[in-house]
Amino acid sequence: MEGVPISAKELVGFASAEKLEKGAPNGHKPSDFMLNARSVIVLACGRKLNEDREYFYKWGPNFNLTYIKLKDEIKQRRKEARRSTEAVKNFLTQGGFKAITEPHGWSGVLSFKMAVYLAGLGVFGKGSFLVHPHFGPVNVLACIVTDAPLKYDTPLEIDVCGDCMECIKSCKYGAFKKVGKRYEWIAEKCRCYDLIMNPVTLKWTYGPCNSKCVSACPIGR
């Protein structure tokens, strides 16, 4: 896609809509966006691409100020992502293809995690979040669903965690349960998830978690 502005700080991957259709849960498939979708373009960033943001590694003692700063950073990054995705969308529609953008959101329609995996931008680590072997934990910014046929990336089939248990040990709320050789993330015990889904009531009830499982990951430092 020569001529389409994509920031050097962003990761871009291409996934087959057919494979995402099979792997995503009901209600979060490409067909819930667009009939006859063929491709999903994923825009994301890894922690190493944010290494100039000191707060990403060292969360401040005042959660309110830290949370506001994080929100401001996310807003700016997603604002940049919207410009990029709109440019790609316009490029595709000018070529006669359909394209729909889906910005990141906790209540979004598309299965972002599965899209990241299929686009080769990360693998599921022990903590159930996506990890790029070089850039670290992956933050999805946006996706584009299109009926354009594209060359798809290959999922990464590697173990990025090995014997590391830092993310599991960092959670004091018991949000990870061992199932066989893997760990299962328990949403109702995750304070970050609760805070995002219920920001007013739970912010003061449980206290902050500050995504310690993600920040504990040593990859991409």
Predicted features by range, described:
Residues 1-73:
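Non-catalytic, usually N-terminal nucleic-acid engagement modules in DNA/RNA processing proteins
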